[in-house]
Amino acid sequence: MTKSELIEQLCSKKPQLSAKQVEDTVKEILEQMATTLEGGDRIEIRGFGSFSLHYREPRLGRNPKTGDKVELDGKFVPHFKPGKELRERVNYS
């Protein structure tokens, strides 16, 4: 599902809200989540899951074009851990 598909689906479920209101709300939620992760904080949505940052250690990589070894810096990557309710819903639906 894309962001625009999510907005369309929410609009059909909540016809009292304008498409612009739904779009602005979805964008604001995603922006707040990105800002929270950017600040190094964790996001927990009970029953759904949690978002956090995992650190990837610096490592030696390889350039696929040339085969040369390349030094890759350490970095933080977003990580999602599904909650119990979401896992059960996906596995038993």
UniProtKB/Swiss-Prot annotation:
Gene Ontology CC entries for this record:
chromosome; cytosol
Q: InterPro entries annotated for this entry?
A: Hist_DNA-bd (IPR000119), Histone-like_DNA-bd_CS (IPR020816), IHF-like_DNA-bd_dom_sf (IPR010992), IHF_beta (IPR005685)
**Keywords from the UniProt entry:** DNA recombination, DNA-binding, Transcription, Transcription regulation, Translation regulation
Q: How does it assemble?
A: Heterodimer of an alpha and a beta chain.
State what this protein does: This protein is one of the two subunits of integration host factor, a specific DNA-binding protein that functions in genetic recombination as well as in transcriptional and translational control.
What's the family?
Belongs to the bacterial histone-like protein family.
Q: What protein name is recorded for this chain?
A: Integration host factor subunit beta
Supply the source organism for this entry.
Answer: Aliivibrio fischeri (strain ATCC 700601 / ES114)
State the gene name recorded for this protein.
ihfB
